[in-house]
Amino acid sequence: MEKEEIKTKEDVIRFLKDKTEFERAVLLATFEIPKGKVSTYKRIAEKIGKPHAHRAVGNALHKNPLAPIVPCHRVVRSDGGFGGDKKGAEARRKLLEKEGVPIERGRVKLSKDILF
């Protein structure tokens, strides 16, 4: 299967067959985040049953082979910061602004309305 052919959760699962169980869980949880919403590394870790693995979630997303299909730009730090290097953070900020996510003072303005 080619990356361009991926449309459904089942397609994502098939494409990620060579990833670890943890990486698949992280990427599938991230795949579910809708446009205009964000989650945090901590929330993803909790969602997949590994509540203390937020750094490992970040590492798995850093190796995301399906960006932007699996929208890792929608996962931010618990303080609304973008994380990563300055260039990557700026690109993520622009993508999120384009999707209608509120940004204030260089961070996502986290609220129950946009948290997934």
Predicted stretch roles:
Residues 2-116:
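Nucleic acid-binding interface residues in structured DNA/RNA-binding domains
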